[in-house]
Amino acid sequence: METLRFSSNTMQVSFVCQRCNQPLKLDTSFNVLDRMTIHELTAPLVMVTANKQQDSGESSSFPEETFLENKQDGVARKFIPPARMMSAESTNSFTLIGEASDGGTMENLSRRLKVTSNLFDIMSGQTDIDHPLCEECTDTLLDHLDTQLNITENECQNYKSCLELLSQLPEEEEASLLNALQQLKQEEESLIQELESIETKREAVAKELDEGRNHSQLMDTEELRYQKEYCEFKRQQLELDDDLKSVDNQMRYCQIQLDKLKKTNVFNATFHIWHSGQFGTINNFRLGRLPSVPVEWNEINAAWGQTVLLLHALASKMGLCFQRYQLVPYGNHSYLESLSDKSKELPLYCSGGLRFFWDNKFDHAMVAFLDCVQQFKEEVEKDDTGFCLPYRMDVDKGKIEDTGGSGGSYSIKTQFNSEEQWTKALKFMLTNLKWGLAWVSSQFYNR
């Protein structure tokens, strides 16, 4: 609060404003303060009544809450005790020590500084404002206190008006006001009860609302789960629909193929009999031989193997068992077995050469095969009297007659026969087999 400055010959003590911190120059009257003045400064702001002074005069402390009302202005005064009481033995006192021109000057300066500090402590203890203050801050503080004083005086005046108005009210009006007050209290109690009832209902409604929200959240969770399940089932349904469409397409394709297969003649598809120039062919294998077209014997043997297989399949389809011979389809080494002599095999294949001209087993095998074709014809004629092959066969002579054409007969044997006639006889035999194949197909596949 104070600042001390020293020099070799002089010493100066200065104070600063407690608001703006500006240095202050104190009045000389602060240097002369007797004990009576200090006692007046430390006394309470408002003196209490004589009785209370006697009761509390010897006490070192003042009552914390004391109000007195001046009957002239009607203002209640509150005693504010000082924050720090000064005495000769104040603990805040101090002695300034330093160098001076003589001992008396230092003692006087210390005393003045102590008195001034005590005075500022007293002033700060009486109010909430710290001292010292500069002139400008003091003016600002006074303006603020004047404003508060005016507000307080206006409030006191309003209170006095209310008291005068209340004192002028007649007793009857007071009684009516008391009745009205009682009614208002009863109405207040009724409203409080109603408020409590409404609060209870509100709590119940809030509880129901919480339950409804919980139920709504549960329903939202269930809805989300059901939605996921629905999407999963929808995906499975789409996959199953795709699978079903795929299966339907496969069934439709299989049905088309089945219808096509039903219309397909197995024998015609398996055994294709046709001609190539002067040769009769079966599955594109030429059966026969010409001087100008020396067909390989492997091809001729393969053609005989297909022919044996065809007749064997037709007989099996009809349930026909040949007499005297048994067909053994064995590719390009097919042969016939004699039923009277099991050890006797008639080969329907040949390798050519000189042995071919002197070996008559090949010729016997071709005549035996012609016998089997004749038996097939006779079996068909038993079921269909109108059935007739285009070329008549003479098994005893081993010849085939061209009844519808030149009328000549052609031997199926190779010995003592030309290749042209042998090839033509084989061609006529394949033609008869083609007719037999057509009849079996019509009887068993086109019904």
UniProtKB/Swiss-Prot annotation:
InterPro entries listed in its UniProt record: Atg6/Beclin, Atg6/Beclin_C_sf, Atg6/beclin_CC, Atg6_BARA, BH3_dom
MF terms (GO), sorted A to Z: phosphatidylinositol 3-kinase binding; protein-macromolecule adaptor activity
Cross-link (Glycyl lysine isopeptide (Lys-Gly) (interchain with G-Cter in ubiquitin)): 399
Mutant phenotype after disruption: Results in defects in morphogenesis, increased numbers of dead cells, abnormal heart structure, and reduced organismal survival. Reduces the regenerative response to muscle injury with accumulation of sarcomeric and nuclear debris.
The organism's place on the tree of life at top rank: Eukaryota
One matching Pfam family: BH3
Coiled-coil regions listed: 140-214
Subcellular location: Cytoplasm; Golgi apparatus, trans-Golgi network membrane; Endosome membrane; Endoplasmic reticulum membrane
Stimuli inducing this protein: Expressed during follicle development in the ovary.
Quaternary data: Component of the PI3K (PI3KC3/PI3K-III/class III phosphatidylinositol 3-kinase) complex. Interacts with the poly-Gln domain of ATXN3; the interaction causes deubiquitination at Lys-399 and stabilizes BECN1.
Job of this protein: Plays a central role in autophagy. Acts as a core subunit of different PI3K complex forms that mediate formation of phosphatidylinositol 3-phosphate and are believed to play a role in multiple membrane trafficking pathways: PI3KC3-C1 is involved in initiation of autophagosomes and PI3KC3-C2 in maturation of autophagosomes and endocytosis. Involved in regulation of degradative endocytic trafficking and required for the abscission step in cytokinesis, probably in the context of PI3KC3-C2. Essential for the formation of PI3KC3-C2 but not PI3KC3-C1 PI3K complex forms.
Protein name: Beclin-1
Taxonomic classification: Eukaryota, Metazoa, Chordata, Craniata, Vertebrata
Protein's gene: becn1
